[in-house]
Amino acid sequence: MFRRRTTAPEMEQADPTAVAAAASIGKLLMKKGNQSDNEQRPTYRSASMTNLRKPSAPKRMSSISSISSESRRSDGKGRPGKINSLTQRSSMGKGDSLNSPLTKEPQHKTRSHNRTSSLPNQRGQQSRNSSGLQRQKSKTHQRISYDEAQRTFKDFGGPQARGILTGQHRTENPSGSIPLRTTRKYIPGPNGLVAIEVPVEKPSNANTSKLLRRSNSAHSALNARNGSLLRKKVSQESLHSQPKKTSSLGNTSSTQAKKGQKAVQERNLAKKHPINSNVPLIETQVREETDQELKLDNSNSSESETVVNSENNLEKPSSLNIEKDDLSKLIHENIELESFIEEKGKEKPLNSDQEDVFISEKTVKGDVQWPKNNRQASTLEKTFNYDNEEKREGNKPVAEHPLPEAEVDDKSVEQLNNISSSGSYSAQGSVENSKPENGNKNLENDTTSSPTQDLDEKSRSIEEKDTLEGTESSKKVEKPDNCCEKISGANTSSKKGNVGDTKDEFFDTVEESDQKTSKSNSSKNTDHSNQTEPTPSLAQYLRTSNTYLSRKNQSKQAEQEKFHKPEAPMVPVTKVVTPIKSALKKSSGSSNHDSSMYSDNSPANGAYLSLTTAENTRLNAQMTMSDSVSRRASLKRSSIKRPQSVGQFRSIRSNSPSPPEKINNKRHSAIPLGTPEKGKPKRNSVMASLSKNSQQIQEPASVYESNGPNKPKNQINKNIKRGSQIAQNNKPSTKDMNSILYPKEPPPRKSSFEKTRSNESHLGFKKLSLRNGNFEEALSESYNGQASQNSTNVNRTDTAQEFFKYLGHSSRFADSDSEDESQFFNQGPSKYNTETEGNKTSGNKNSNGGNGAFSLFKSKSKQKENNVVSPGVSSPNHTTTDPAITSKKVDKKFSGLSLRAASEAEPAKNSNPSMTNRLRFSSNPENGESRLPQAQEVSVTKEKKGSFGKKLKKIFGRKK
């Protein structure tokens, strides 16, 4: 845009003679050419002004054919003025066209400036180019299109229109006498095609001109739509031009709606008249624009002079002229509004006889009846009617609640004052403000009084209401008075200064007033809702608060009564529901011991947890005998490694459980430890005793810290006697053992992670495998009902050999004929004789001391499973030839330990004692074949028995 203004001095060269020449050429070449040069000049002036006023750039952007079609469509509309100016410029610019193509570049500059410059510049250019009327014609068409393009560029603020309209110069150039200058090459721009002048032959130009006209018309339509929107948003000229369009022409919407039709008509015109279609269309546009622009010139006689004076800057005079028109229109509108308001104020019925309570209602009605306030009247109707309804509903005697009325009056005054702040409604607002107050005082003053008078009347009427309603409302009335003063000052300034105000100021005031009115209406709606409702809402709130307090107390008492009743059972319920106790305790012992040992804060809680874990492990062992046997084997192994004193210490503690342990014994053991066994001397099921004894064995290990050696010695003796009686009655026979030890089918191995493990490395891992679980279950079940214990050592060794034939397989793939058997049964016994004899003493001591229970417990499992890993020591129980002696000894040893261990001593007797000893002390199952003489074993057991008693005397200071 700076570039165009720099080219302004070239555009100043145009003279009115060129305008006259262009007009004469237009007359000769146009079908309807009957206009004189004098007629064209004012039309051209008005056209330039209308171009500045109107945002319809598409016509400027479009080709001359499109301009002509638009002018035909828009008869009596504001756009043809623009188009007429273009046509006049084209006729005037026809004289501008020089013979040399070098002059075309300054012509572009002059064209661009002609778009921005005033009429005398274009006239000077035309006078400069008076020679060559036909050349002038062609170049004036180009100039017109280019000028329109630059006008749209100026209006739009972008170069999009320049290329399109310059592209239309091609279509215009072939109409001229010089084809080289008329045609241009189009280069695509960001918003359209940019034209570059290229000499082209006439026929090719004619063909391309049609196509380019079509494309340019399409681009012009698009750019017109976009440009009109941009103008309305961006440029101040759009703000100046929009009111003129609406006021003088009122064709903004219609012209934009017809853009698509214009493009089609432009195409048709270009087809019919590729060369001369532009000229007659231009002349018709001139006539249309002259009619409309002459009317505009009558209202704005000084517009052309201001434009002529400002050659380089057209924005200022155009804005001033437009502002003058707008201000004059606003003045007329304000005068009309004032007259109308005066008539209405006089016609209003003056009802001052009614009470003051209803005066505000009358003011509301008067406010509602104002018709000129299109938006604001509707909003006021809604707000005031809503307020009146709330008043009537919430406060039937309105005098009882004076504050809401005063507030409504104040708000009505504020809303009216806010309405009066708008420029067009400035006079109306002041008169409207005076209306309700004068109605209260028998409107005798003129409604056209100054806003200061209105303020006085308002203050008087409000003071009267205040005397009736209360002094509190006076404070609130002062604020609306101040608002009225401010707004009235704005109204007076708007009335007086409308003539001198610029158009930008007018729009700013209008926008601000609209925003203020909208904000005031919204805020007042909220204020009315907040201020009219508070009396019922306050009363309701106080009532609800009182009722809430009373009801709340009642409800709280009722709830407390309801909850106090279940609170007594709730405490134990919550304790029972705790996951540990509910899952682990299955008896009513918790209810008996809530306060002492089973409470969460009791010191026995840790002991209880340990016992419950032990019981759970026992129950899991009962579910699968394989698991129980494996646990027994592991316990047996660990018991041998522990020192004797520790084992004895634990055995004694196992006989004296803590209070929760006693409860568990009552719970889970059929024979409680605290009661004598005389009533129950015999048992048919050894498994029950085994399971219960395993419980008793496993519990003291977990409760070792919590239990103390506080139990008397007599109880231990009772337990020993008890276990001896049970063991004597439950000794299995060798025949049953033979049936057990010869299974029909070896069960398949269930885990294969040990298949590459050597027999020496089995240790306790083979015990942990499930390969022999089925056999162990059968073995444990076979003990039920077995009573005889007479057997020979040969039978024991045979059964043991057959038993180990089955158990000797190191992997599932090993057969009964595998090498493992030969190694298992054929290795020399001499190696382990010394080991067994040397270790039986310690093993038996451990078995007597309390780990003996674990050792026997595990020796059974070894005989059942594999007898490979045998840390247990139960040989003295097995090696007695006389069953009575063995039963007595075993009963003395294991009566206080566990029923399971006591019952396991008898089946162990049927097996080879040397095998048990070997397997007990050797990790290699193959070495278990070596046997000890029975006499040696008997002597060893006797020695161990004596040594065990001595050690018990040393530890506990008592004799057995």
From Swiss-Prot:
Assembly with partners or alone: Component of eisosomes, large cytoplasmic protein assemblies that localize to specialized domains termed MCCs on the plasma membrane.
Phosphoserine, modified sites: S48, S220, S235, S238, S319, S339, S352, S434, S461, S630, S758, S816, S818, S855
Protein keywords: Cell membrane, Membrane, Phosphoprotein
GO CC annotation terms, alphabetical: cell periphery; cytoplasm; eisosome; plasma membrane
Function: Important for the biogenesis of eisosomes, large cytoplasmic protein assemblies that localize to specialized domains on the plasma membrane to cluster specific proteins at sites of membrane invaginations. Required for efficient incorporation of the eisosome component PIL1 into eisosomes.
Bias (Basic residues): 947-960
Lipid bilayer topology: Peripheral membrane protein
Record has Iron as a keyword: no
Modified sites of kind Phosphothreonine: T467, T675
GO biological process: eisosome assembly
Organism: Saccharomyces cerevisiae (strain ATCC 204508 / S288c)
Annotated family: Belongs to the SEG1 family.
Polar residues compositional bias, start-end: 33-53, 84-102, 115-135, 206-226, 236-258, 371-386, 431-453, 531-557, 619-628, 641-656, 686-708, 725-737, 823-836, 866-884, 909-927
Subcellular location: Cell membrane
Biased composition range(s): Basic and acidic residues: 144-154, 285-296, 388-413, 455-484, 558-567, 746-760
Segments for region (Disordered): 30-185, 206-318, 363-607, 619-760, 812-960
Biased segments, Low complexity type: 298-312, 420-430, 587-602, 709-718, 839-848
Record-given protein name: Eisosome protein SEG1
